[in-house]
């Protein structure tokens, strides 16, 4: 998710390169995160004013457009916001356009041609200004500013305390869709976070299909339930709070598939993460322990009892060496339980995923 490594020599499975629409979403994500790290020096977070006390906690893009603003006031805000963008960070001008696009709605035309033209905003200008300052000065991720991430064919609600879904993780959903008979199976999404994977998989399922999504974080469970209800898949997705397999005792041995994008960053690497990630995204969703493998190994331990015979699993990893280690580990320790275990490339040609089948 966050590391870069050398192009692997071999791969068992090559994912297709991003399609044009997916490439646009990938660019939006990259311009919202990694490019900021490269172009804008960190600024102490103490410089930014707090949000207004009465600020609405609802994600910006889900709020009603209840704040009429005249042309002149909006233009003045745009000038002030643009003036904060340093010459080294031109991508922030795109973020400003996206912020105003997410915050705006068409205003009804007035019957009086002399009436001033109004813009309908989803937040008052003082709140938008505070949100913008937090993004520019505090390096707060743009996705947290607007409250969403464009992911696959979804607009996923996100907020502080929930990991922002990455474009490469979309491949997990594609791999689920390639499993024979997946539509009618029961699936587990462990460490669901925003619920993006669970919702995307649920939208592909047939009448008998179901997703059990778990997370230990109360905030993640709340946001995942919001996304499940927004997309109307509450009859397909059951969100359960708890750690990994613990909430799934009643479906043990009945799962067609287990999916997880767990924390896999080595603890010593956390201080070196770009500020957008290290300062703001939840450590709970990032820290994989000394070698980044703590949670991945725990998931491997629970797989054989969770999956039905022939069941499928796919985990996201930190890439290359971590994936290769997991493949060797599973094939050595559980050779009698699993087959067709292999590393899978992401669209950057990194061995990002490990997948396989229960015998």
Question: Over which residues does each language-model region extend?
Answer:
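N-terminal chloroplast transit peptides
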Residues: 1-27
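N-terminal mitochondrial targeting presequences
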Residues: 2-4, 24-63
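Residue-level signal for inorganic ion chemistry
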Residues: 99, 139, 169, 197, ...
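Conserved SAM/SAH cofactor-binding pocket of Class I
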Residues: 168-272
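Conserved AdoMet
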Residues: 59, 94-179
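Mobile active-site "lid"/loop adjacent to the S-adenosyl-L-methionine
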Residues: 262-295
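Conserved Class I SAM-dependent methyltransferase catalytic core
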Residues: 290-358
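Helix-to-beta-strand junctions that scaffold the AdoMet/dcAdoMet cofactor pocket
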Residues: 206, 281, 307-309
């Amino acid at each position: 998710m966050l590391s870069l490594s050398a192009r692997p020599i071999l791969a068992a499975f090559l994912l297709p390169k991003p399609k044009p629409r997916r490439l646009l979403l990938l660019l939006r994500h990259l311009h919202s995160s990694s490019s900021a790290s490269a172009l804008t020096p960190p600024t102490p977070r103490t410089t930014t004013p707090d949000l207004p006390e009465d600020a609405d906690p609802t994600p910006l893009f889900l709020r009603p457009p209840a704040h009429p603003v005249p042309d002149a006031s909006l233009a003045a805000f745009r000038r002030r916001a643009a003036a904060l963008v340093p010459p080294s960070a031109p991508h922030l001008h795109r973020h400003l356009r996206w912020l105003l696009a997410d915050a705006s709605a068409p205003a009804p035309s007035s019957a009086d041609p002399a009436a001033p033209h109004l813009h309908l905003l989803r937040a008052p200008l003082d709140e938008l200004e505070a949100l913008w300052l937090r993004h520019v000065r505090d390096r707060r991720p743009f996705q947290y500013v607007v409250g969403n991430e464009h992911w696959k064919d979804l607009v996923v609600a996100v907020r502080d305390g929930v990991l922002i879904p990455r474009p490469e993780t979309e491949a997990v959903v594609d791999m689920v869709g390639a499993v024979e008979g997946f539509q009618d199976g029961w699936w587990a999404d462990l460490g669901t976070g925003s619920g993006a994977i669970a919702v995307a998989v649920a939208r592909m399922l047939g009448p008998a299909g179901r997703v059990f999504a778990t997370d230990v974080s109360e905030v993640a469970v709340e946001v995942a339930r919001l996304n499940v209800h927004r997309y109307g898949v509450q009859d397909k997705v059951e969100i359960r709070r708890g750690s990994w397999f613990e909430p799934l005792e009643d479906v043990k041995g009945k799962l067609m598939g287990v999916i997880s994008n767990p924390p896999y960053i080595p603890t010593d690497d956390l201080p070196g993460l770009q500020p957008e990630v290290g300062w703001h995204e939840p450590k709970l969703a990032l820290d994989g322990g000394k070698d980044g493998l703590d949670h991945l190994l725990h998931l491997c331990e629970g797989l054989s009892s969770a999956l039905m015979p022939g069941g499928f699993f796919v985990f996201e990893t930190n890439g290359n060496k971590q994936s290769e280690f997991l493949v060797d580990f599973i094939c050595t320790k559980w050779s009698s339980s699993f087959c067709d275990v292999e590393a899978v490339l992401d669209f950057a040609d990194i061995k990002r995923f490990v997948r396989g089948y229960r015998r």
